[in-house]
A protein has these predicted regions:
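Divalent metal-cofactor coordination and adjacent catalytic microenvironments
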Residues: 1-150
Length: 150
């Protein structure tokens, strides 16, 4: 099984919140915490579907069933690879793939940074998704918005 865990995820930039408020035509700041929550959720969901980092983050892939290759996501750079006992494992990273010497259990820790071009391309989808969340849209609507990321 392979599992992706969030270790740390940065908050959206204040400019993203302002862009979202403009997109959603929010007239005041009374709902700011709710809007920020919707924006944070939307950014994380869109970055995972698009496989492009929108928020800086630190992640861990735990893999015990792999063929000696583990994928990292969203343009991640590997920080460490350890075995089940926390000992370092040698690896080579090429793009989004981490090549290992064995298929034993590993934990691959990596960091992500937003790419400005991807951020600009995906921000409209984020705003649309966050607005749909804020408006209480159903899963079918939310999923149709995410299709724009592919």
């Amino acid at each position: 099984m392979i599992r992706l865990e969030v270790i740390e995820l940065a908050e959206p930039m204040s400019s993203a919140l302002e862009d979202f408020k403009l997109y959603a035509a929010v007239p005041d700041n009374t709902q700011e915490q709710l809007l920020l929550s919707a924006l944070r959720t939307a950014m994380d969901k869109v970055q995972r579907v698009a496989d492009s980092a929108l928020l800086a983050g630190r992640w861990r892939v735990c893999a015990d069933d792999h063929p000696g290759v583990v994928s990292v996501y969203m343009g991640g750079k590997v920080v460490s690879v350890t075995d089940g006992e926390g000992l370092p494992v040698s690896f080579k990273q090429r793009g989004g793939r981490v090549y290992l010497g064995s298929d034993d259990y590993v934990e691959v820790e990596f960091v992500t940074e937003p790419v400005p071009a991807d951020y600009a391309r995906l921000l409209p989808v984020v705003c649309q998704y966050a607005t749909a969340l804020y408006d209480g849209q159903d899963d079918k609507t939310l999923n149709s918005i995410l299709l724009q990321c592919l």
